[in-house]
Amino acid sequence: MTLEEFSAAEQKTERMDTVGDALEEVLSKARSQRTITVGVYEAAKLLNVDPDNVVLCLLAADEDDDRDVALQIHFTLIRAFCCENDINILRVSNPGRLAELLLLENDAGPAESGGAAQTPDLHCVLVTNPHSSQWKDPALSQLICFCRESRYMDQWVPVINLPER
């Protein structure tokens, strides 16, 4: 590996960390503003009803999920819909970290019916535009720019690794 190749690889790693941090910030803000939709079926319903307000689609799956044919079909349909409607898509390679971010302080106790709380489907997460104002968030702008640059390089669904904390 030459010095130039090493430098390019290091810059790419730093950029991915920066994009991962930006994604964490966007998810945190969207969660506090209640502009997140979680779940494959819930996402499909929202995309069908109001695709113009969706600014980001996250698809999260681990190696075990790669063998789930039904989930892969849903992912393919969601990706196609997002590409057709100019919705930015990211694939999250560590769904465990995504779950930590989205379920943090989220009714951590058991369900009120006395049974165990059912964990939500985090395979698909949509971030929508708040109706009160347009996002002027630099972290969201950075993610949108990253998605656009990835599309220019024919990488339609870039893979992001959320940094561990």
Swiss-Prot record:
Keyword terms of this UniProt record: Cell cycle, DNA damage, Growth arrest, Nucleus, Phosphoprotein
Coarse class of the protein's main subcellular location: nucleus
Subcellular location(s) of the protein: Nucleus
Residues modified to Phosphothreonine: 2
SUPFAM superfamilies: L30e-like
Molecular function per GO: kinase binding; promoter-specific chromatin binding; protein heterodimerization activity; protein homodimerization activity
Induction or repression: By various types of DNA damage and growth arrest.
InterPro entries for the chain: GADD45 (IPR024824), Ribosomal_eL30-like_sf (IPR029064), Ribosomal_eL8/eL30/eS12/Gad45 (IPR004038)
Biological processes annotated in GO: cellular response to ionizing radiation; cellular response to mechanical stimulus; centrosome cycle; negative regulation of angiogenesis; negative regulation of blood vessel endothelial cell migration; negative regulation of peptidyl-serine phosphorylation of STAT protein; negative regulation of transcription by RNA polymerase II; positive regulation of apoptotic process
Subunit structure of this chain's protein: Interacts with AURKA, GADD45GIP1 and PCNA. Interacts with MAPK14.
PANTHER family associated with the record: GROWTH ARREST AND DNA DAMAGE-INDUCIBLE PROTEIN GADD45, GROWTH ARREST AND DNA DAMAGE-INDUCIBLE PROTEIN GADD45 ALPHA
Functional note: Might affect PCNA interaction with some CDK (cell division protein kinase) complexes; stimulates DNA excision repair in vitro and inhibits entry of cells into S phase. In T-cells, functions as a regulator of p38 MAPKs by inhibiting p88 phosphorylation and activity.
Name assigned to this protein: Growth arrest and DNA damage-inducible protein GADD45 alpha
Gene field: Gadd45a
